[in-house]
Amino acid sequence: FKGSYGAISLDGVTPLAWSLDHVGIFARTVDDAALVFAALAEPSRPPAAPAPAAPRLGIPRAFLERYAAEEVGTHLEAVARTLSRAGATVGDVALPDGWTRIDDVGRLVLRVEAAAYHHRWFPLHADAYPPKIRELVSSGQTVSGVDYLLAQEERARFRKAMTTVFESCDFLLLPAAPAPAPPLAEGTTGDPIFCAPWSFTGLPSLAVPSGLARGGLPLAVQLVAPMLAEDRLLDAARWCERVLEFTAEPALLEHGPR
């Protein structure tokens, strides 16, 4: 779970990209995440109206079909049917124009801001950086100021346009990742394509465990809410958690290092 951008203070957090960074919460249940968020959230957050008992959920169909593996897409449809039978309204929604560019634009912002933060140390200690971070910082140093500002302009347009999406639904429903969780030995958490847009726009989001893939590793669905609607998001996620009743545990030892 992560709240809206700025909902939890970044004081004391070493930044990766200051305009993208969020403090997130890993918890066993939605209730646990809500307790931690209540303790950490900025006290000036405005209260939000509670979410409807059975929410209106919008599936960004084109986004799903472009990036989700077949197994993940099939699982999301099964989850949507389960939620619909429990009373949720589920329909398709369209993301704003430019959604196909959001990942590239967000990565540009990430690269530049990482390069800016590390500009003092990187020339002296480049060899000490992990290869992926070294590549990230190096590539950010080559981006022009004009391109960075144009990316921020495109970001602002997309964020503003997202408000219209929530006129036809309470929350987006989509996978947490385009493929099942990768084995531990691969050393990666997977492709962030379904999560990155919400860091880019600052919208709150929450992933709910919802099943196991054919290989026994976890699957999860994700809810995305309008800005500053964390309380409503947590209410809706509690409802989804109760409806889905997912309690199985992946066979983690089978997928760890030998």
What is the predicted role of each segment?
Residues 70-72, 102-112, 183-189:
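Short glycine/threonine-rich loop-to-helix capping motif typified by GTGT followed
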Residues 70-94, 119-124, 148, 152-169:
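Acyltransferase
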Residues 106, 149-150, 154, 177-196:
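Short, surface-exposed loop/helix-turn segments at secondary-structure junctions
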